[in-house]
Regions:
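Short Lys/Arg-enriched alpha/beta "domain-start" segment
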Residues: 1-61
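Residue-identity detector for glutamine
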Residues: 3-5, 11, 57, 88, ...
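Aromatic-residue detector
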Residues: 8-11, 16-17, 21-22, 59-62, ...
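Generic detector of short, locally flexible boundary/turn motifs and exposed helical patches
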Residues: 33-41, 79-82, 98-99, 135-139, ...
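An intrinsically disordered, low-complexity acidic/polar region
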Residues: 129, 160-162
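Core AdoMet radical
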Residues: 136-155, 162-203
């Protein structure tokens, strides 16, 4: 099985983790790549389901050699490939002057992508006729894993730290829909301008 086949299999069937304590933490439910963990196969890092029902039934498991610190991917006890897990980013240990943890403002996706939902509420969410069927934007907020509104200053501060401490190379910004006039375009633009004024980071 080549590297691309391994990645396709993992993303389709998930990965059964014997221990959750490997690599950066994943999260159950909510917006973004929830129920997943970042996994590196060869030179490619992808998000793989680990907390889903399918992953619990997956034939793929990880075995970790605690003496060497390396991991291998197994299928029916046969070694398929060496794999690794990106570690918890350093910027997760920081907080703003107001005491907000950086991870409530933006998260690391994969190994080098910073992601944030600028406005965590949406006027469409509570109406089944207008809500996006895939969206779980309010779940993260209800679970206390994020803040409702990220300010331009907060986002610039976190982005600078993520680049400096963890080598983040680009950023994704999404938002809930706050109104029917510009749908949040002006505010997300203000946030993007604050970030690029502080750090050179493709958004």
């Amino acid at each position: 099985m080549n590297q691309q086949q391994v990645i396709t299999e993992l993303q389709s069937r998930g990965l059964k983790l014997v221990s959750d304590g490997v690599g950066a933490s994943g999260r159950k439910g909510g917006a973004g790549p929830s129920d997943h963990k970042a996994v590196t196969v060869g030179d490619t890092t992808v998000m793989v389901p680990v907390f889903t029902e399918g992953a619990a039934q997956s034939p793929y498991v990880v075995e970790r050699d605690h003496t060497t610190g390396t991991s291998v991917l197994l299928k029916e006890k046969e070694i398929i490939a060496p794999i690794s897990f990106p570690t918890q980013p350093k910027f997760y240990g920081l907080e703003t002057a107001e005491g907000i943890p950086y991870w409530k403002i933006a998260l690391l996706h994969s190994r080098n992508v910073l992601a944030t939902t600028v406005l965590q509420n949406c006027i469409r969410y509570d109406n089944r006729k207008t809500a996006c069927q895939f969206c779980a934007i309010s779940q993260s907020l209800e679970a206390g894993r994020t803040s409702a509104k990220k300010t331009p200053e907060q986002l610039a501060e976190v982005a600078e730290a993520a680049v400096r401490l963890d080598g983040v190379e680009h950023m994704i910004m999404t938002t809930g829909t706050p109104n029917v006039t510009d749908r949040g375009a002006a505010y997300i633009t203000e946030c993007a301008q604050a970030i690029t004024a502080r750090i050179s980071l493709p958004i």
